[in-house]
């Protein structure tokens, strides 16, 4: 399955508590909670380029599925991680105690991130 395309956030749950737990400052949490971010994915074989735009903040990540890479987090921190496929429609990674599962289903992406007992869920639609 190829996931290439542009997707815009439609809804999110537990944004504020999750971002607080990640250490994001309160002013940035308040600015970011209502922004409908856009993710652009270029998926070619095992290579993935991901550009996420939240207002003026842009995060670029490139990785090869199944290989260690450096990812930039929402806080701007760079972390080492391995992004793996589960089945043919889920990308899964773990970094700094956070498990991230990104599920592709037609024109919808559901990203679920878990940190301790806080679960942040973001649903995006293809635009």
UniProtKB/Swiss-Prot annotation:
<feature type="modified residue" description="N6-succinyllysine">
    <location>
        <position position="36"/>
    </location>
</feature>
<keyword id="KW-1017">Isopeptide bond</keyword>
<dbReference type="GO" id="GO:0032052">
    <property type="term" value="F:bile acid binding"/>
</dbReference>
<feature type="modified residue" description="Phosphothreonine">
    <location>
        <position position="51"/>
    </location>
</feature>
<dbReference type="GO" id="GO:0032000">
    <property type="term" value="P:positive regulation of fatty acid beta-oxidation"/>
</dbReference>
<dbReference type="GO" id="GO:0051978">
    <property type="term" value="F:lysophospholipid:sodium symporter activity"/>
</dbReference>
<dbReference type="GO" id="GO:0071456">
    <property type="term" value="P:cellular response to hypoxia"/>
</dbReference>
<feature type="modified residue" description="Deamidated asparagine; alternate">
    <location>
        <position position="105"/>
    </location>
</feature>
<dbReference type="GO" id="GO:0005324">
    <property type="term" value="F:long-chain fatty acid transmembrane transporter activity"/>
</dbReference>
<dbReference type="GO" id="GO:0045179">
    <property type="term" value="C:apical cortex"/>
</dbReference>
<dbReference type="GO" id="GO:1990748">
    <property type="term" value="P:cellular detoxification"/>
</dbReference>
<feature type="modified residue" description="N-acetylmethionine">
    <location>
        <position position="1"/>
    </location>
</feature>
<keyword id="KW-0963">Cytoplasm</keyword>
<dbReference type="GO" id="GO:0016209">
    <property type="term" value="F:antioxidant activity"/>
</dbReference>
<feature type="cross-link" description="Isoaspartyl glycine isopeptide (Asn-Gly); alternate">
    <location>
        <begin position="105"/>
        <end position="106"/>
    </location>
</feature>
<keyword id="KW-0007">Acetylation</keyword>
<feature type="binding site">
    <location>
        <begin position="54"/>
        <end position="56"/>
    </location>
    <ligand>
        <name>(9Z)-octadecenoate 1</name>
    </ligand>
</feature>
<dbReference type="GO" id="GO:0070301">
    <property type="term" value="P:cellular response to hydrogen peroxide"/>
</dbReference>
<dbReference type="GO" id="GO:0005782">
    <property type="term" value="C:peroxisomal matrix"/>
</dbReference>
<dbReference type="InterPro" id="IPR000463">
    <property type="entry name" value="Fatty_acid-bd"/>
</dbReference>
<dbReference type="InterPro" id="IPR012674">
    <property type="entry name" value="Calycin"/>
</dbReference>
<feature type="modified residue" description="Phosphoserine">
    <location>
        <position position="100"/>
    </location>
</feature>
<dbReference type="GO" id="GO:1901363">
    <property type="term" value="F:heterocyclic compound binding"/>
</dbReference>
<dbReference type="Pfam" id="PF14651">
    <property type="entry name" value="Lipocalin_7"/>
</dbReference>
<dbReference type="GO" id="GO:0005829">
    <property type="term" value="C:cytosol"/>
</dbReference>
<dbReference type="InterPro" id="IPR031259">
    <property type="entry name" value="ILBP"/>
</dbReference>
<dbReference type="GO" id="GO:0005543">
    <property type="term" value="F:phospholipid binding"/>
</dbReference>
<keyword id="KW-0446">Lipid-binding</keyword>
<feature type="modified residue" description="Phosphoserine">
    <location>
        <position position="56"/>
    </location>
</feature>
<feature type="modified residue" description="Phosphoserine">
    <location>
        <position position="11"/>
    </location>
</feature>
<dbReference type="GO" id="GO:0015909">
    <property type="term" value="P:long-chain fatty acid transport"/>
</dbReference>
<feature type="modified residue" description="N6-succinyllysine">
    <location>
        <position position="90"/>
    </location>
</feature>
<dbReference type="GO" id="GO:0032991">
    <property type="term" value="C:protein-containing complex"/>
</dbReference>
<dbReference type="GO" id="GO:0033552">
    <property type="term" value="P:response to vitamin B3"/>
</dbReference>
<feature type="modified residue" description="N6-succinyllysine; alternate">
    <location>
        <position position="84"/>
    </location>
</feature>
<protein>
    <recommendedName>
        <fullName>Fatty acid-binding protein, liver</fullName>
    </recommendedName>
</protein>
<feature type="modified residue" description="N6-succinyllysine">
    <location>
        <position position="78"/>
    </location>
</feature>
<feature type="modified residue" description="N6-succinyllysine">
    <location>
        <position position="121"/>
    </location>
</feature>
<feature type="modified residue" description="N6-succinyllysine">
    <location>
        <position position="46"/>
    </location>
</feature>
<feature type="binding site">
    <location>
        <position position="39"/>
    </location>
    <ligand>
        <name>(9Z)-octadecenoate 2</name>
    </ligand>
</feature>
<dbReference type="GO" id="GO:0005737">
    <property type="term" value="C:cytoplasm"/>
</dbReference>
<feature type="modified residue" description="N6-succinyllysine">
    <location>
        <position position="57"/>
    </location>
</feature>
